Every structure is written in structure tokens, then in C-alpha cells.
Amino acid sequence: GKEIQEVKDGEVGEICVAGPTVTEEYYRMPGATFDSKFRYDSKIYHRMGDLGYFDANLTLRFLGRKAERINTAQGPLETERCEAIVNTVDGVRRSALIGLGDKDPVEPCVVIEPERGFRNRTAINEIEKEVLDRLKVRLPHFEITQMRTESSLPVDARHNAKIHRLD
């Protein structure tokens, strides 16, 4: 089977859950069961596919989907670590962290979708400057300098929120 390693508080790991609603297997899907279910301390756990860590107050902090984390020359960078900063900038409707390049390490790039009323060149220039300034302060280790602007980002039709960045 798979090796399971518990992480220490403050370390990033995959969020796994156990409890009465966690099923032992997927119906007629042994591959999916093998990939996402495991037994630990006599409980069945489900791998959520999300990354997170427990902070000093033992609050679980969500960092994004495991499949969407990018590996940069400075180390792994999770989507929410970056997007949570970018999305607080006035004029940003939503953002997506992507990696530029065909193989690891990739160069981090922030794609923004501006709010209506912020789609002219002057506003976009101001937004991009503010985004890069905030990232330089909050995530200096990653040296994020690449940005793109799109009129809209592709989202999941059911939620209108989950960004399709792997397409």
C-alpha cells in the first residue's frame, strides 16, 4: 500500500478526514479507493486532495488543491497562499496562480480577472503594481514577477467559483 506520514503542526500536508460518514471504498472503483482511502489507527481515512496545516492555535488553514500546487525554483507554492493576498486588492474579482513552463521548476504567474469598472489599461496597471508590491512583501521568497490579465477566468459550472487552471 501507500506510506502514510503524519506531519507536525505548522507543516503543510494533505488534509485527510475520518468519521462515520467516510466510506471504506468507492463502489466498483478499486483504483479510486486505493488512491484516496487508507486505514490508520484502525480508522478509515479519506484523502481530500486539499493541502493545509495547523497553525499555532491548532486551527486548520486551507492552502488549496494538491493538484494545483506549483513547484518553483524556490520551493512548492500553494494556490491559496498566493491568491488570498491577490484577491484583497481593490479591482480584483478573482485570481489564479499558475506555473509557466512545461516541467518543474516552473515560474509562478498570477492571472487576475478584474472587476467591471477596472478593465481599462490605467486601472489594470495600478492593480498589477499593487498585486506585485503585496506579493513582494508577503511572499518575498518566491520572487513573483509574472502577471497576466484575463477578462474572465474559466470556472466550474456548478459552483461558479472553482477555477479551472489545469486545462
Q: What residues fall within each predicted segment?
A:
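Flexible glycine-/small-residue-rich
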Residues: V17-G19, I112-P114, H159
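Active-site lining segments that contact anionic ligands and/or coordinate catalytic metals
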Residues: V12, K43, N57, A67, ...
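C-terminal boundary motif of the adenylate-forming
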Residues: K2, G49-L51, I85-R116, E143-Q146
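Short, solvent-exposed loop/helix junctions and linker helices
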Residues: E6-D9, P76-T79, R121, N125, ...
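Conserved C-terminal "lid"/linker of ANL adenylate-forming enzymes
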Residues: A96-G101, V110, L132-D167
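Conserved ATP-binding/catalytic segment of the ANL
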Residues: K2-A73
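AMP-dependent adenylate-forming
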Residues: T59-L63, E68-R69, T79, R94, ...
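Adenylate-forming
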Residues: V22, S36-K37, T59-N87, V111-T122, ...
